[in-house]
Each structure stands twice: as structure tokens, then as C-alpha cells.
Amino acid sequence: MSDIGVFNAAVGADRAGLRNLKRVFWNLEAPGLYEQALQRGEAQLAVGGALVAETGIHTGRSPKDKFVVRDAETEAQVWWDNNGAISPEQFDRLHADFIAHAEGRELFAQDLYGGAEPAHRVRARVFTEFAWHSLFIRNLLIRPERDELATYEPDLTIIDLPSFKADPARHGVRSETMIACDFTRRIMLIGGTSYAGEMKKSVFTYLNYILPQAGVMPMHCSANVGGAGDSALFFGLSGTGKTTLSSDPARALLGDDEHGWSPKGIFNFEGGCYAKTIRLSREAEPEIYATTERFGTVMENVVIDPVTRLPDFDDASRTENTRCAYPLPFIPNASPTGRAGHPKNIVMLTCDAFGVLPPIAKLTGAEAMYHFLSGYTAKVAGTEKGLKGPEATFSTCFGAPFMPRHPSVYGNLLRDLIARHHVDCWLVNTGWTGGGVGTGRRMPIRVTRRLLTAALDGSLAKADFRRDPYFGFAVPTSVPGVEPHILYPVKTWQDKAAFAETAKKLVEMFQANFKRFEAHVDADVRAAEPTMSIAA
């Protein structure tokens, strides 16, 4: 076996059990990875210099194929209702077969950090079969200085072999595709899928497992910080505006997806962004668009013209989930440190396709925990096959697939931090107003931005509020620059009876979903549940 590149020779591939490899390319930077990816036919070059790769049949994550080793350590720690389990013996067979499959192959290795705060970072070593995967994860995680590589020792090892096909009977998994996590031995295996996002989310899953024990809150959120050091967190599921609304020219971007909250403040887990590109335009999102024209960016499943190599961001023939991965410094106002003080504001974003939630509401600590555990948004027809109308989605902690522990662990951590640091919390509806999908209209982005500006500059917290009779939280009675009736959802509907019926339906959905958490929360959190205080 030959090694090419800079690495700690005392802790080589054999530490991960890998042996009889043809070659390992260690910590190659973008030019070297471009050469390898293009020579191997893994990717194409787009106009401007981005590397474009396809992922085949897997154009998104495979959450049902993700498994955690159930052993003496994890038995009482992992939320098994939400995480598939395999035995240590099944993982041993899987790991041995992974090692055998890798023999004779060339692999790419990246030594990286997950976490911008040194005291709470994980050293993640990622072995990949594809050169473009190596560039992807190099873009997404935090890159050590070159002189750190000679003494780097990994805490976590990830091996990603898309050509490996699992045997469900032998390995205890569901299909040929699998993501297997051994938290005790700190090994993660990814096979049978070329979707690069699995690597990024594997690191996130590991951090979500280990950090709560250290009193650090891991979060699926974006974050930014103002000139006065006033930071803000934006929680939200896909399609709620998390990336768009945290991108503010007046505020520095910490990150767009994964953060931690420690006794020192908040910090990004990553060193890059993984932005959706479907229908991306230079006019609407100029900073993200500019990254697609830069050398070093990886574009995933984006259709490009075979002759001109121009990308067509409106083409969803492969998937709606087209993306680009780029280092954070590609964004002009990105924070150079990825760290900030304790947040002044927390924003929970929801896309309410039923059109009954107000555009903004102020939450108490108990209400914030309730809505964090609920993780509500709504899917709209067209986003998923077979979906005819709005469908409520509850993804606890705004990221259920990545949460190994019980949601109450994260919810209680968040609630304690909110109370300790006197954080203002807001629920923001970026969905529909004046009716649901089909009868109403999308909440104007200018309204949402105006409300967020007032929330983040502190003026909204001093406004007059009314108690929403359907959902119980506090809603401002007026905000400068926002039409008053928009703050009263029922006033935006022509059919008041239909509004009441729809609101009642959504309240009942919240109540039904939260039953699974009632035994794990205090009475004040249970009391924060929507209860319909008026007859409807």
C-alpha cells in the first residue's frame, strides 16, 4: 500500500482496520481532488469551475436504512423508538465485510474537525471511495491547518463505500443501503448510496449523541450575529426558509445548518454550506448563486448542458433535491470564527400550509420547549409523490432523523439555556395567509423580514401583545411597516367559519402528536399546548 499526502503516519489506515489497500490519498486539497474525480469519470466540470456529480438512484438521505449498535452503553442512552438497532455481532460482520470490500482499492482520506469550539469539537477522519466525496466532506467540515495534520488523531472514523452492498440477512439491515453507527467504538459505515449528505449527517448524529453529556446543546438550525454581538438561532425543517432568512447582509452568518450551544456561547459544527439549488437565481439569492460559479464548489445532481456546461437550476428531472456544497469563506459575510456569544433571540420557523398560524408569535420558555419538541411544518402537494393537499409534519427537535437520544434530553437542555440567558423566543410562519394552499397566498417575504428585523433589534419584544384564542401564544397587535390585519389570521380569511374549522383541526393535530411526550415534560410545558380557548 502506498500513501500520498500529509498525515500522521503513526495513525494510518490500519487504525480503522483497513489493510491491503492499493493506495490512500491523504488530505488532498481541491486541485488534486478535481484531477482524480475527472480522471476517474466521477464528475464533470461546469462553467465557472464547479465540480458536478450525480448520485444515481439515491438523491436524498435514506433514514429508514440508518442503524445504531445496541450495546451495554447505548441501551439506556438511545431513543430506540426513533433509531433502528443492530447487534454488536451484526456490526462486526458488516465492518469485516467493509474491510474486505475495500482491499485492493484506492481510497481518499480527510482529517477534519466537527465543531468550531475547540473544547467541544470531534476529530473526524473520513475515508471515501470517490474523490468528489472527499472534496464534498472537506468543504462541509472544518479544515485543520496543514501543520496540525502531522499530529492528528481521530476521535471518529467514517468509511463511505457506495459500491458496497449490504446483505440484510447477514448484517441485520433493511436493504443493500445502510448507514451503521457504532457510538461505543466511534465508527460509522456508509454503503450502497452515493448521496454525499449521508457523511455530513453522520458527523451531526455523532455530535448529537456525545455533546448533551457535556452540557452542550446540539441543534439543527442556522445562526447569524449582528454587529453588537447579538446572535440569533433559526430552527426549521426543509422549506421553511432557514437558509434564506438567516442570510442577512447586516449580520454575519455563522452557519446554515448545524450548531452547538455551550457554556461559552454558540458555535458552528461545520466549515461549509450545503445549499439547495432548485430554482436558484442570481437575483433572489446572489451569494449562493455566486458559489456555483467558483472553483472548489461541488454541485450534486444539478443538470448541466453537455456542450456549454451551463447549469440549469430549474431542471428537476433528476430530483428536486439538487444542491451545492462550498466552504463558508465563499460567502462574503460569513463569520471567520464560526463562534458567537449566547443568543439573544431564537426563531422557530414553520411553513403552515393551512394558513391559520400568525406570521409571528412570542413564546414563553415552556411554549418554546413545546414547539421545539413538536417541530411542526406542513408539506405541500407537489413536494412528495402522491400528496394531494397540505399534510402536517411533526419532526421533533426540528431534526428527528439525526437525534439519537430521547427528544426530552434536547428539549430540557434548550429550556434551561433559554431561561439562564434570558432569550426571547419567536414562532414565525413563512407559510400561507388568507387561506390555506389553493385559496390563500404565501406569506410575503417582505413581511417576514420586517417582523424578523423588529424581533432581532429588540423592538418587537416591547410591543403590545394579544393572546391568540386558537393557539394560546402572544401575538403582537401592531408592527410598523406591516399591515395590521396580517397579524390577525382570521381577518385575512373571507370564510371565518372555515378558518375556525381549520384552526381546530390543526390544534387537534398538535395535541395528538404531543401525547408521546407528555410523560417526559413538566406541567407548564403540557399547559403550553394549544387548547382552543374560544368556541369554534
Curated annotation (Swiss-Prot):
Q: From what superkingdom does this record's organism come?
A: Bacteria
Its encoding gene is what? Answer: pckA
The record lists substrate as bound by: R61, Y195, K201, R323
GO molecular function terms noted in the UniProt entry: ATP binding; metal ion binding; phosphoenolpyruvate carboxykinase (ATP) activity
Q: What is this protein called?
A: Phosphoenolpyruvate carboxykinase (ATP)
A GO CC term assigned to this protein in UniProt = cytosol
Using the UniProt record, give the first listed, main subcellular location. Answer: cytoplasm
Cofactor: how and how many bound: Binds 1 Mn(2+) ion per subunit.
Give residues annotated as binding ATP: K201, H220, G236, L237, S238, G239, T240, G241, K242, T243, T244, E285, R323, T448
Q: Which family, according to the similarity comment?
A: Belongs to the phosphoenolpyruvate carboxykinase (ATP) family.
Could you say which enzyme class this protein belongs to? lyase
Q: Which GO terms describe its biological process?
A: gluconeogenesis
Q: Where in the cell is it found?
A: Cytoplasm
Q: Which UniProt keywords apply?
A: ATP-binding, Cytoplasm, Decarboxylase, Gluconeogenesis, Lyase, Manganese, Metal-binding, Nucleotide-binding
Give the protein's function: Involved in the gluconeogenesis. Catalyzes the conversion of oxaloacetate (OAA) to phosphoenolpyruvate (PEP) through direct phosphoryl transfer between the nucleoside triphosphate and OAA.
